[in-house]
Amino acid sequence: MKITLTLLSALTFLFSFINPAHAQKEKSLLWKISGKGLEKPSYLFGTIHLMCPQDIKITEAMQSAMSATEQLVLELDMDEPGIMQEMMSASMMKDGTTIKSLLSEEDYQLLENFMKDSLGMPLQSLAGMKPMLLSTVFMLPVLQCQPGSYEMSLVQAAKEHEMEVFGLETVADQIAVFDAIPLKEQSAYLVKSIKEYDQTKHEIKDMIRLYQTQDVDGLYKMINKSMAEMENAEDALLNDRNLKWLPQIEETAKEKPTFFAVGAGHLAGPQGVITLLRKAGYEVEAVKAEK
């Protein structure tokens, strides 16, 4: 169960912070959605999927927003039974493909040694995992803790507020995002992550710091160049999903005031959720960041 929770946290980390394309100047992770005929406002919150449990905070502003809404909508319905097992199963390659078959002997040895020496994990146990998902495991030691889950904390808060929980996507939807990127490109990213691991560790720490200060603009500037070598990655991992979510968010907000929570990387950019909602005619205002 521990490895399942760890990998789930790492898996969803990529969806939080991959290459947002434009900055939001306001320092806030919580946004109020109103106008365009909405009887009551909804709220949009940007999550991070790699955080030590003691750093996960449901703030007073978030509590107030949840009190003013009737349902919680996440990327995935984390309250659904068996979702972690489903995600683990879907993260594995099919038809007997393994990471060894995708790498040169030299790169495979590099990966095997890295897993053993730096992570204390045998590669054999994860050899069938899709390369890009395997690379997320490298991020975990930076925290020096067993990651907590903002999503599960929000689910717990929703239960306390007697709110229903729903998801914008299914596990199959999220895995399909990775499947749109060729395995060879994923493998190249995996090897690059190892060779540049010291730099990667610093970047992750900086991203977490920027998140904690709610500096979305600074976060954007830091990660804008990430994964640039992977063709169409930004569209597959971020923009296409935002566009798909927009009608769902609109319809849901019209039906009931809703607390939406998605990866923070989805908020910014010319095709980010905030901009898309504004272009659709809604008022989207930053809720003042709490100290």
Q: What are the roles of these predicted feature ranges?
A:
Residues 33-236:
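Structured, acidic catalytic/metal-binding patches in enzyme active sites
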Residues 25, 54, 240-244:
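Short secondary-structure boundary/capping elements
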Residues 23, 58-59, 87-89, 273-277:
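Short, glycine/charged-enriched secondary-structure capping and boundary segments
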Residues 20-39:
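Short, low-structural-confidence N-terminal segments
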